[in-house]
Amino acid sequence: MGYRSDLVIVHSFMHKSHAREILTAFTLDKRCQEYDLTRHLKISCDETHTADGKRDVYSLVFVGEQWKWYEDSALGAYEDVKCINSMLDLCKDFNKERGIPYAYKFLRIGEEDGDVERREDSSQCKHGEFLEDYQESSAYIHTTIEQDFRNLKSVSEGLTELQEKENVNE
């Protein structure tokens, strides 16, 4: 059993080659293969409009449902979680060493009411800020209320129907 969370983690880049390099470095981690983490990883190429014209944004997106997301516990973080989180470290390293801009967004919703977590980071440059703005409109938490009552009627219709049933039973 254990506590489970739904999550979306996004790493966005200005160029396809940058996304490819990060993905390649990530998949070299033995934990990525051991836990088959690429199964939860999606790739997005989205054309977005800017003041300068059109730009492509390339994103690596983890989508996890009902995940045992333990970053810190008495026994330490889960290895799959550590591996997924290591992609942000790769982005930071590639930015520091090679100037590759990135933006990062982490969204998690836990089982309990109000257990919502958001984290963001970027390369803190013009392109990083652009990517952050892009992510802001592309990944967000939206809460809804769902109901599954059947045969809902207005109060007047319901009262009329109840009255008719009472008259039949008399």
PLM features: what roles do these ranges have?
Residues 26-27, 36-170:
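Charged interaction segments
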Residues 1-27:
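Short, extreme N-terminal segment that most often corresponds to the first beta-strand
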Residues 30-31:
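Intrinsically disordered, low-complexity, mixed-charge
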